[in-house]
């Protein structure tokens, strides 16, 4: 099936603050003179109205279950009516969520095959593709967003699902390097690639050997990336991750009007250890990422990451200010009741960013 068409959307509201003068290079660090980065102002939302997905998001109006069930018949077994007269699935059931994802990836994004092993993180497709749409806006800086096969992106911590790299290529034709510390995760992503001709030759995989590193050992001397992206491990320990999963299951049961009764045996928010938690949690992971980014400043146009906990933004801004980065932007995203932030930074001036991007897109 043809890949999704791209419509031009208005530039997302962001804020930026930057150092005037030459961008920092990995070999020399000037004293930061930039004003402290500012967070993006919260979008004005009418009372009772939720912030919607990105305007280009195919799922902005929810899931069309009747169409999906025709396109992907396996989904029928998991769809049931809600008390409000709509159709839905049990989002606490990993098999239901995985089947919905497979249906979405086939119907909307042209995948012939997608699967993950039991216990692996099963991400919601609308939220994942939202990140990519905002990255496209970031890269084109208010101009017309174009599909461009020359754009290279690095997905840090791709997991067993590989959805960022998969969606990034299917929607925007970007080329991806996807990294992970778990060899089993990479094996599964390779299986997905092998079963989808549209992905072959466009996604390459690299294993991170050092559990305390982010970019080191992954970015090679000859690499140049227009974008890096990451959804960091959220929790700081296995216990914390388990408690978080239990809360999610209970909240789903309450939303359905059920009596909370989840136990460890019914924690269906899948996720291997490296996908859900790391020592120090999201805060430490982001600190390492920011620190390491300086060494690869000339090889990457934009570094980006999701930030789930708002309180982790301040230490990120402080660390970026110390490095003297040229530009820092924060974009708020929301899917349902979940709010997250896209943090982006570049060591390059706007003029240099536009020159870099235009050379890549035009092929000169």
UniProtKB/Swiss-Prot annotation:
InterPro entries: METTL16/RlmF, rRNA_lsu_MeTfrase_F, SAM-dependent_MTases_sf. Residues 1-53 are annotated as: Disordered. Pfam families: Methyltransf_10 (PF05971). It is an enzyme of class 2 (transferase). Disulfide bonds: none annotated. One of its GO terms (cellular component) is cytoplasm. Residues 39-53 have a biased composition (Basic residues). This is Ribosomal RNA large subunit methyltransferase F. It comes from Shewanella sp. (strain MR-4).
């Amino acid at each position: 099936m043809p890949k999704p068409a791209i419509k031009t959307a208005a530039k997302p509201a962001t804020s930026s603050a930057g150092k005037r003068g030459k961008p920092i290079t990995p070999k020399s660090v000037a004293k930061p003179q930039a004003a402290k980065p500012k967070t993006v102002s919260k979008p004005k939302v009418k009372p009772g109205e939720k912030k919607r997905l990105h305007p280009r998001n195919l799922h902005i109006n929810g899931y069309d279950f009747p169409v999906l069930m025709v396109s992907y018949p396996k989904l029928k077994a998991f769809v049931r009516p809600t008390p409000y007269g709509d159709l839905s699935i049990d989002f606490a059931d990993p098999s239901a969520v995985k089947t919905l994802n497979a249906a979405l990836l086939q119907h909307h994004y042209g995948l012939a095959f997608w699967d993950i092993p039991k216990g692996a993180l099963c991400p919601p497709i609308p939220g994942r593709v939202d990140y990519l749409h905002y990255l496209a806006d970031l890269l084109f800086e208010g101009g017309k967003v174009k599909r461009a096969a020359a754009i290279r992106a690095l997905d840090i911590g791709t997991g067993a699902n590989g959805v960022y790299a998969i969606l990034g290529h299917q929607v925007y034709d970007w080329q991806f390097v996807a990294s992970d510390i778990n060899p089993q995760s990479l094996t599964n992503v390779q299986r997905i690639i092998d079963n989808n001709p549209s992905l072959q030759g466009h996604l390459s995989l690299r294993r991170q050997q050092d559990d305390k590193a982010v970019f080191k050992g992954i970015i090679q001397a000859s690499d140049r990336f227009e974008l890096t992206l990451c959804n960091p491990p959220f929790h700081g320990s296995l216990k914390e991750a388990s408690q978080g999963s239990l809360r999610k299951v209970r909240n789903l049961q309450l939303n359905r009007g059920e009596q909370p009764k989840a136990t460890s045996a019914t924690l269906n928010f899948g996720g291997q250890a490296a996908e859900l938690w790391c020592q120090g949690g999201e805060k430490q992971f982001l600190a390492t990422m920011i620190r390491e980014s300086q060494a690869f400043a000339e090889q990457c146009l934009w570094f980006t990451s999701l930030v789930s906990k708002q309180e982790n933004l301040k230490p990120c801004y402080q660390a970026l200010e110390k490095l003297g980065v040229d530009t820092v932007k924060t974009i708020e995203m929301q899917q349902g009741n979940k709010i997250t932030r896209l943090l982006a930074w570049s060591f390059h001036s706007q003029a240099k960013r536009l020159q870099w991007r235009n050379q890549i897109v035009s092929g000169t």
